[in-house]
């Protein structure tokens, strides 16, 4: 199971985000703030009584600003072996694991964002599969626009 950034498009321009741009990263290990925010959007049971989660991951504002990214996130549907999870406990568990992963990597950028999500998914043995993965990225373009003198 993996989430990839191979065909990640800039939502503002519909252009493919370049490999070079994906590799740009900033330090994130000296900070106590959350690097990637995890949100449990929904919990439900499928037809075979498997608990399904709708998860959302977002790069926090501080690092988006440092990387000149307006939005970097990912939504997905996650199938689990869990029986009766609560939204609050799942968010807490997933956020703690994500914080440990992010702190251990020292850097964050577009590529590392997706690597961290994959690492989180692979460390949660109760996750059986993922579907409907929707990565989203909008790069900051204000600095790239020419100034017009009137």
Curated annotation (Swiss-Prot):
Q: Name the domain of life this protein comes from.
A: Viruses
**Can you tell me which family this protein belongs to?**
Belongs to the nanovirus U1 protein family.
Give the protein name, as stated in the record.
Protein U1
Organism for this UniProt entry:
Milk vetch dwarf virus (isolate N)
């Amino acid at each position: 199971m993996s989430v990839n950034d191979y065909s990640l498009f800039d939502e503002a321009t519909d252009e493919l985000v370049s490999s070079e741009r994906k590799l740009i990263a900033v330090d994130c290990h000296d900070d106590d703030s959350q690097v990637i925010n995890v949100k449990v959007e929904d919990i439900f049971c499928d037809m075979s009584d498997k608990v399904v989660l709708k998860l959302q991951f977002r790069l926090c504002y501080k690092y988006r600003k440092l990387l000149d990214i307006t939005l970097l996130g990912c939504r997905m549907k996650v199938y689990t072996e869990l029986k009766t999870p609560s939204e609050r406990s799942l968010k807490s568990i997933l956020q703690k694991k994500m914080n440990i992963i992010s702190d251990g990597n020292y850097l964050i950028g577009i590529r590392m964002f997706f690597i961290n999500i994959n690492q989180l998914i692979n460390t949660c043995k109760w996750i059986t599969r993922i579907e409907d993965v929707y990565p989203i990225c909008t790069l900051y373009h204000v600095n790239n626009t020419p100034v017009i003198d009137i």
